[in-house]
Amino acid sequence: MSNLLLGVNIDHIATLRNARNTTYPDPIYAAFIAEQSGADSITIHLREDRRHITDRDVEMLCKTIQTSMNLEIAATDEMINIACTLKPHCCCLVPERRQELTTEGGLDIINKANKLQDIIFKLTEAGIRVSLFIDPNEQQISVAYNIGAPYIELHTGMYSHATDATTQNLEYKRIKKSVQYAVNKGLKVNAGHGLNYYNVRPIAMLPGIQELNIGHAIISRSIFCGLPKAIQDMKKLIQDSRRG
């Protein structure tokens, strides 16, 4: 069974910094610690309102990350131009609404297929690996495949935030079925959103998933045990789960 990678989202390091408009804690230093602690990639989301990660953060991280940088962006001209200029290793296209606390669902790529196909081509031409953040839905996956997306990231929010075991099990089955469907089409599959130390194990056990992107849970735990241990604990958990 293939090794499962861990992408660490450091957005909330920047959230804490910006809460008091200080220069600390520094996301660039957090990325360094994360890499030293076993993170396989670093994920950041440059939102249109710059509520946490800033343009300077992205520029500095592009220069300093030694593993892989996954830049989450909305499918807007401004963001695509930033990505093509800075050339992160990977761009994950995500939906974005200004009033949301965090990304609330997957891209509706069915109704935006032509636009997204052009963006995928432009980013790929710039040497950037492209991923689409989508809900676990076979129709969305089919369109992702048809417009040339090499990677998808399945939105695990409905599973993660389920309030009862029955609902969570139904959402898990949707994710499992979607992973199998995507892999059979030749897509590479990542997953993330809302995953934590208590719900990640079943998702980590799915053999078709290559990487899990996790942020809030890791940063929250790091308050009590430190960032290195929080990352090491999560990496051990997902890799032990993958091995069974």
From Swiss-Prot:
Broad EC category: transferase
Site (Transition state stabilizer): E153
Protein localization: Cytoplasm
Binding of 1-deoxy-D-xylulose 5-phosphate, residues: D11, H12, R47, H52, T102
Catalytic residue positions: H45, E72, H193
Pathway named in the protein's UniProt entry: Cofactor biosynthesis; pyridoxine 5'-phosphate biosynthesis; pyridoxine 5'-phosphate from D-erythrose 4-phosphate: step 5/5
Predominant localisation class: cytoplasm
GO biological process, one term: pyridoxine biosynthetic process
Record bears the keyword Cytoplasm: yes
Binding positions for 3-amino-2-oxopropyl phosphate per the UniProt entry: N9, R20, G194, G215, H216
GO cellular component: cytosol
Listed InterPro entries: Aldolase_TIM, PyrdxlP_synth_PdxJ, Pyridoxine-5'_phos_synth
One GO MF term attached to the UniProt entry: pyridoxine 5'-phosphate synthase activity
EC numbers on record: 2.6.99.2
Keywords: Cytoplasm, Pyridoxine biosynthesis, Transferase
Catalytic reaction(s) noted: 3-amino-2-oxopropyl phosphate + 1-deoxy-D-xylulose 5-phosphate = pyridoxine 5'-phosphate + phosphate + 2 H2O + H(+)
Name of one Pfam family that matches: PdxJ
Function of the molecule: Catalyzes the complicated ring closure reaction between the two acyclic compounds 1-deoxy-D-xylulose-5-phosphate (DXP) and 3-amino-2-oxopropyl phosphate (1-amino-acetone-3-phosphate or AAP) to form pyridoxine 5'-phosphate (PNP) and inorganic phosphate.
Subunit structure: Homooctamer; tetramer of dimers.
HAMAP family per record: PdxJ
Entry protein name: Pyridoxine 5'-phosphate synthase
Source species: Blochmanniella pennsylvanica (strain BPEN)
Upper classification of the organism: Bacteria, Pseudomonadati, Pseudomonadota, Gammaproteobacteria, Enterobacterales
Record gene name: pdxJ
